[in-house]
Amino acid sequence: EMKGKLDGMAIRVPTPNVSLVDLVVDLKKDATPEEINLAVKKEAEGRLKGIVFYCEEELVSIDFQSSPYSAIFDAPLTNVIEGRMAKVIAWYDNEWGFSNRLCELFSFIADVARPNYLQDLVYGQTKSEHRC
């Protein structure tokens, strides 16, 4: 379904840990860079808060080192050609951002799989001793 509608690349830049994603998409309807940026900003401040950061500053790759975000959306670089061909750029620290997501994943798994695991370790309680 997405064949021929999505193209992009990731580029290693000359910093120890920072990379960028160059994403080009063919939109279903016309959009302006401002509309795309507004949509990303809304999500970055909403359900993707802490994962995606919306950035309007003109920064360079080293500025994103040690960022805890999975992606830093570079709003000034958003471009649209003929209304439907959109290009967006996002930066990421491929070690620190990834590590933060792993910590969140492990925390989630621990809470879902064994919500009282830490309590078991600290207090030595067995499953039958837990109260709802």
Regions inferred by a protein language model and the residue ranges of each:
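C-terminal substrate-binding/catalytic lobe of Rossmann-fold NAD(P)-dependent oxidoreductases
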Residues: 1-86
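NAD(P)-dependent Rossmann-like dehydrogenase/reductase catalytic/cofactor-binding core
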Residues: 68-132
